[in-house]
């Protein structure tokens, strides 16, 4: 990291283990930007926030980025993407609900609402968010996770419980037919294409 830091003004690192970012930062003389780790995915959360602002703020073209009170329902694993999205929702004054099977939720933090019922999570939500059920490095847990997440798919019955104006997001790549149906991936409410 020291050698690289001598040649650049910043380092954007996509790593598997978050500890590697921490280790890099101890020897770097330039900023280290987390592009993805097993702990968080802040760049994805920023991109998603911009999509939500573009869709729901009164007039982003003149600098009014207010999305206060909007609700994001994340249906899936309490993982790096969920953690980062919850953090940016808190900063922007949005509500965040996580629907995960027992044992896959994020720790309670007093901000987010956690449920084990996807229908409860999406009720009236402005944004429905899906992510892969089997993250990078978890391939050995695929069968177990797919079984645990049965019933946590973004599909038409779930979308029908959200607000009429709701959009669907996914950090991609998506396993269509698993965590999200083709119908919802390509629907008019999808902000994926």
Where is each model-derived feature located?
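General beta-strand structural signal in soluble alpha/beta enzymes
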Residues: 12-14, 32-35, 41, 74, ...
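Short, electropositive alpha-helical surface patch
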Residues: 179-193
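Rossmann-like adenosine-cofactor binding region
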Residues: 109-182
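Phosphate/diphosphate ligand-binding glycine-rich loop within oxidoreductases
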Residues: 1-53, 176
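Generic hydrophobic/aromatic pocket-lining and core-packing "Φ" positions
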Residues: 1, 21, 85-86, 118, ...
């Amino acid at each position: 990291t020291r050698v690289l830091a001598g040649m650049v003004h910043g380092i954007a690192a996509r790593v598997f283990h978050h500890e590697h970012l921490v280790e890099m930062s101890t020897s770097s003389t330039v900023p280290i930007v987390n592009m993805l780790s097993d702990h968080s995915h802040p760049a994805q959360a920023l991109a998603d926030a911009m999509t939500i602002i573009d869709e729901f703020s009164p007039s982003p073209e003149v600098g009014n980025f207010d999305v206060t009170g909007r609700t994001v329902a994340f249906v899936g694993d309490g993982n790096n993407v969920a953690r980062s999205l919850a953090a940016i929702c808190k900063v922007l004054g949005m509500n965040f609900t996580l629907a995960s099977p027992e044992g896959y939720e994020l720790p309670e933090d007093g901000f987010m609402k956690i449920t084990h019922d996807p229908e409860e999570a999406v009720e009236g939500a402005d944004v429905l968010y899906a992510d892969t059920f089997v993250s990078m490095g978890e391939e050995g847990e695929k069968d177990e996770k797919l079984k645990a997440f049965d019933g946590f798919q973004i599909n038409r019955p779930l979308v029908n419980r959200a607000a009429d104006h709701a959009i669907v997001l996914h950090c991609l790549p998506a396993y269509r037919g698993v965590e999200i149906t083709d119908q919802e991936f390509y629907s008019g409410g999808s902000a994926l294409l």
